[in-house]
Amino acid sequence: MSQNSLNSGKSGKNNSSSSSSSKNNSNVTNNNSHNQQIRDNYNQLSEHEKNMFQKYEKSGWNGQVSGRPSHAGGTFRNGGSASSAILPAKNKNGEITYKEFDINQTTTGRDSYRFIKGSDGSVYYTNDHYKTFTRIK
């Protein structure tokens, strides 16, 4: 799975209408491209991962999903260790907090596959215990 950039491509305003129009068209193109990349990232998940994503979506990301004893809905400490990648800490609306959700049911302990859900509605996937993240929503 390809890793998606975590930057959100913001642009400033310009007083020139032709320049502003050009920038607006560029922003639409960039947003469409960014959204397509997120859809492509989601589509690269395995069927099991997509199924679990849909179960969490249906439950409103409120913790455990039916038949799934796992660690779901616990606080994810963004940048909490030296080996962890760092997710965006803020957006235009303020601070973003994150919760983690296991993907696989294991008999003992936990594996490295997780969804990380942001308070801004974003969802990231990691299969290497937070070393890398791919945005899927």
Q: What do these predicted regions represent?
A:
Residues 54-137:
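Functional cores of ribonucleases/endoribonucleases
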